[in-house]
């Protein structure tokens, strides 16, 4: 009987040790979470916009401007309500004038802006005070104007839109 009690006692202690061992099968780890500054802008539309002036009014130097509003853009930003979009060209225009109108509901459109002389260092604000969030399908309107006194010319320009603080 004594032997049976010892065996039963050892069995119960073994069971208690097994339960304690299995109760310690967890581990913890600290996880650091960060959301970094995100600025993204994308333009949708034709790769090349063709603006051709082919009309004017007799007796007026200013020719009839050419306009295109087939492009849109999408923007996402999570940093600051002081965020803005700027526009610039790859090089100054020698003749004529190129203007841009960039719509926005998250920010304030600057209206139609002349970007003919705006290069990287002198980019023009086209949308200001953009709230944090995202919007898509916002219109971009280009207007090309020239005078009869400018004569005939052709130019190819690259327009860059940039999201900045």
Where are these regions (language model features)?
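Sec/Tat signal peptide C-region and signal peptidase I cleavage site
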Residues: 15-23
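Positively charged n-region of N-terminal signal peptides that target proteins for export
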Residues: 1-4, 9, 19
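Single-pass alpha-helical transmembrane signal-anchor segments
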Residues: 10-14
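N-terminal small/polar-rich segments of proteins
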Residues: 23-165
